[in-house]
Amino acid sequence: MARTKPDPATTPTSTGPASEASAIPLHGTVETPPATEPGPRVVDPSVPVGEPPVGPTEPLVPASEPLTPASAPSPRKDAPRTMRDLRLATEARRRSTTPRAADNPLREGLRLERVPDPHIFVLFGATGDLAHRKVVPALHQLWRTHLLPHEFTLVCVGRRPYTDEAFRDELKASLAKFSRSQPIDREAWDDMASRITYHRGDFNDPAAYAALADHLDTIDLAHGTRGNRLFYLATQPSAFPEIIAQLGHAGLDHEHHDGGWRRVVIEKPFGRDLESAIRLNREVGKVFRERQVYRIDHYLGKETVRNLLVFRFANGIFEPIWNRRHIDHVQITVAESLGIEGRGAFYEETGASRDFLQNHLLQLLSLVAMEPPATFEADALRDEKVKVIRAIAEMTPAQVRRDVVRGQYGPGWVSGKPVVGYRQEPHVDPESETETFIAARLMIDDWRWSGIPFYLRMGKRLPKRATEIAIQFKEVPHQLFRDSAADPEPNLLAMRIQPDEGIMLRFGAKVPGLGVDVRNVTMDFTYGSAFQTDSPDAYETLILDALLGDASLFTRADEVEEAWSIVDPIIAAWAEEGSPDFPSYEAGTWGPAVADDLLAREGRRWRRI
């Protein structure tokens, strides 16, 4: 029976009064806008994604010049003046620069025409690891592929003292390490860097937010960003409530009557249990409406995950067999060869259950198991995902002991190199009981999936990095070729999320010859070979969606709470069990041996990835 759950948190909407504190001096300067009149960017649909527009953009004036629209440079005389000029010049450029691979008909449909409104992107936690590794590289990639408007401006908020120029140098060094486009396009970076300012302030200081509000108003006037602002919280989760409240007190949540929007992106983890998630949802709801809130889970931005819905609902051959009558079980694996990468303090507070099960794994499960939404709108999609999570059977302590396995890695070898155990990692308790591996058998109580187990596993320091969804179909009712088949196995559909994103279908086929010899063969699709283009990074996809106001791939308040109501009983049952026997698996292996028993007792086994 599906579990019962407390009433969801109410999310009243209110906006706190603007701060009475006097504004402190602005920390940062703003350059003038491009030469063209403010307005939406023109994107020629004949140009593939990543193809630069015709004609170089004018550099912005130095930061030392007055911040007035009058200081903008005049338009280039040789720039295209009509859409016809633009199309002719673009076509000539394409013929000279586009490889023949672009003629692949599968590339049709890859061309994006949507560009966000002019806006200011406000990045909290700009000096942190997430901002440097993921957020800024994603913004740079969107900029260099012309998917951000000319009026785009990035305001980086942090507590450390930086000048604009010094912080730009820091970001440039990070791009050299973490950008997926190497070497860095110097012209594109210089153009983007001129739109970056640094704003210093403590997250709990009202005066810093008042100064930030003035800073953003100045940019609005100079760059024509129309009051559109996206606040990205790339900070420690403990800072979320304070930042949200201060944004409300400073009036930064107010949307303009003339259409200017305000949105906030909140990173995971969203709470550390059901109670804290409900409390955080309430705090967010006091300032922002639900339609303004984008709770990000980067796994939902991965290409194969996004393709899962297309695969299911745009092809007539799969959905009729996507049910308990044809599917034997489902496996979802998230394997990481890395350890905790210096994040000992963070992982001691989360563990695999909070870090992966509550979000990534349950999100993947819900996309596999959901019913077709009535439309492809955000709320219709999320309604169906919530129904799936609500239908997952709640576990008693006895069921947790039977159907959930936790583990922690000890010393071992990964990729031919010795590695330390979790308890030897920096900032980790030498007697830590934090799990770095979790495997679970979950059941969904609904008409489509009743009786079909979903096996989920995630682990650190496993032999390889791989994420996969495997749909194991049932055997044929009568095996005609059992005697001739070398290794008769049921059909399997595997969706590789990382690396080498793609889809594989396994089926039996006759070996050429005079006899009837059956072997397993595969049909394999990979994005790189089919479309001859790199898939975008998940953060590029999700940031662009947030800027466009598309919440389809972001989690809703009730969705987060339902997921925590699955994980909380597991953590509570572990607390009653006492100390686990850790470490329970060597680094470089596939986890504790007892995890195999989850499947073996029912005559199944984990798929070899």
Locations of regions flagged by a protein language model:
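N-terminal intrinsically disordered, low-complexity tails
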Residues: 6-69, 74-81
